[in-house]
């Protein structure tokens, strides 16, 4: 059973904040996947990606986080700093699980839809190889986004993932709550310079010319 302490709930709020600032424009739903795998020598590896559905009435499709700089004309390097900060927050969540004596999860799926914030914790034994990453990505995309495999390779990937999965004895667990804050929309450009990872990071959206909004990271020592 999950022990969602006050600190963990505060981290949930920070995760939401970083997600909202990393997704430009208006959107209806979002799904995020992240894995964190411990290696020897305190080395960690893993991956993170998310997809969101833009709001609109015309035919739509999910947009991948790594497509954002090109689709929204955002400077890629600066945008990826925001994405890295989001992944760092997920690492803090995992560290807090360890501090509270809970079993450490290997991967999570976060969904935001209909003003609900859901976190699904999974404890599978992950190896972190490129084949595993690819197979799981195709499987996950099919499960959560309902994107059907378009090629024999993708169909094989789903079959391979199911066949090679190394489930933990611990069952998946879930946290479900309302969102903590209103979404920030129409974020156009990003400024993430002059900050250090060791500093406390806060976000501030400020209006600029032509009603543009600039996303700044403010650093407090």
Tell me the role of every PLM-derived stretch.
Residues 1-70:
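N-terminal "first-domain core" detector
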Residues 3-10, 14, 77, 81-88, ...:
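Alpha-helix boundary/N-cap detector
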Residues 12-14, 84-101, 220:
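Short linear interaction motifs
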Residues 28, 62, 98-105, 119-122, ...:
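Short, solvent-exposed secondary-structure capping/transition elements
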Residues 114-221:
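Acidic, proline/glycine-rich low-complexity IDRs
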Residues 30-35, 104-111:
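A short glycine-rich, hydrophobically flanked beta-strand micro-motif that places a catalytic Asp/Glu
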Residues 22-23, 100-101, 109-111:
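A general structural signal for short secondary-structure junctions and capping/turn motifs
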Residues 55-92:
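A broadly used, surface-exposed interaction patch
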